[in-house]
């Protein structure tokens, strides 16, 4: 018993460590993905109108590298989470991620963090696209004073893509918030269903409202079960022994042999003074056989009652001579 009791907390602790590792991989991968996307956009816009010699090689490589590493971490965490959930379902255990952080599930926390990261990234991209000036008239007048017009083209131009991409990333973040809300609602409904199943006798007394078009149909609550205690209560060992004692012996044992079954030996020992009358089907005479323990004082036999009145009739016949 002690080995089983110590094995269960070790298994739960291991599952919690795995859940924390999966959560860390999700958050780390999402953060790297957002940073990589931001660096890639900034590097692309900064190096778009500059020659390759003036553009830093680190700025061009850091963004895609961070994005690839973050995407790989998210994919790894996703596959590890599916494998862990499948293993828990095979063992028939409860999912430990249902109450991961402050009573909420791990998926809910992940969606909240993803939504916050994408919302922040989208706002930064939108601010960058709006704050940096584009190709307006003030920027277009600068190259007129220079002799070489080929080198005097505006270098910060084309930030319209950031102004379009920013709201799209913000929209993705809002979608993550909606998914988090749906996850929380599903978890609440599933926990409510499990509590109702575990309760068994819990019965809702509220009417059911069903909307059909513009009309609302109200159905009364379902009736309570007929035998709530018999289905919910578990049989106790004392009750089983009592039922075994009170149950009568089988019909075949009484009819053929007139002896109690082994299950009712205790009942026969308690009822020593009781007689069981059985009818034997083999003989034609209606004799009554006694089984069990007979009392000490037996009643007189039927033959003795027939011979008793015959003796006084025979005595005078012998006494009177011819």
Swiss-Prot record:
Subcellular locations according to the entry: Membrane
Cellular component GO terms held in the UniProt record: membrane
Major location category of this protein: membrane
Keyword Transmembrane helix: yes
Spans traversing the lipid bilayer: 22-42, 57-77, 112-132, 159-179
Keyword terms of this UniProt record: Membrane, Transmembrane, Transmembrane helix
Protein name: Transmembrane protein 171
Native source organism of the sequence: Mus musculus (Mouse)
Gene behind the chain: Tmem171
């Amino acid at each position: 018993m002690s080995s089983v009791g110590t094995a269960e907390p070790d298994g739960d602790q291991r599952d919690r460590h795995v859940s924390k590792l999966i959560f860390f991989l999700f958050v780390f991968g999402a953060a790297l993905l957002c940073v990589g996307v931001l660096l890639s956009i900034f590097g692309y816009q900064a190096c778009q109108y500059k020659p390759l010699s003036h553009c830093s090689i680190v700025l061009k490589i850091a963004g895609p590298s961070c994005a690839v590493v973050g995407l790989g971490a998210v994919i790894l965490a996703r596959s590890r989470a599916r494998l862990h959930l499948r293993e828990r379902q095979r063992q028939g255990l409860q999912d430990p991620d249902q109450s991961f952080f402050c009573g909420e599930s791990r998926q809910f926390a992940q969606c909240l963090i993803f939504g916050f990261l994408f919302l922040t990234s989208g706002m930064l991209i939108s601010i960058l696209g709006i704050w940096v000036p584009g190709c307006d008239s003030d920027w277009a007048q600068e190259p007129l004073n220079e002799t070489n017009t080929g080198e005097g083209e505006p270098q910060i131009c084309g930030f319209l893509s950031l102004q379009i991409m920013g709201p799209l990333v913000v929209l993705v973040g809002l979608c993550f918030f909606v998914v988090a809300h749906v996850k929380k609602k599903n978890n609440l409904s599933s926990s409510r269903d499990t509590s109702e199943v575990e309760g068994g006798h819990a019965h809702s007394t509220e009417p059911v409202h069903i909307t059909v078009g513009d009309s609302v149909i109200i159905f009364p609550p379902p009736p309570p079960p007929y035998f709530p205690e018999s289905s919910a209560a578990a049989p106790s060992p004392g009750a089983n022994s009592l039922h075994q004692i009170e149950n009568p012996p089988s019909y075949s044992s009484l009819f053929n042999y007139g002896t109690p079954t082994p299950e009712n030996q205790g009942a026969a020992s308690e009822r020593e003074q009781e007689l069981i009358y059985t009818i034997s089907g083999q003989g034609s005479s209606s004799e009554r056989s006694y089984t069990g323990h007979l009392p000490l004082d037996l009643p007189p036999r039927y033959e003795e009652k027939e011979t008793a009145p015959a003796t006084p009739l025979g005595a005078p016949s012998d006494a009177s001579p011819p």
